[in-house]
Amino acid sequence: MQIIDKQTNTEIEKSTDRYIINFGILKKNQIAKRTVQIKGNNLEGLTSQSDCSCTESSPEVIDKNTIEIELQYKNTHMTKPFDKKVYLNFHEDKQPKVATINIKGQVTL
């Protein structure tokens, strides 16, 4: 399984047990969105859940080997660092899989 950042067209590195997407420094009220792709074999049954309401994930099945997920951090009106998680549950080749994506960054003036 691969998770690819569509903005940079690069594979997201896995750190121990999770994938990390660093939004970096964001300006206050800036839109913080990133679309990623999960690539694998016979992907199905995707569900996603965020650890708080300030993080949103919108999955879309492209084909049996590709799922796209738009990730959004919605609290950019607050100037502070953030580190949120999105949990993905799905099956690859009929085997259950779980992937955790950390979304982090810093909102500044």
Residue ranges and their predicted role:
Residues T66-K80:
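Extracellular/luminal low-complexity segments enriched in Ser/Thr/Pro
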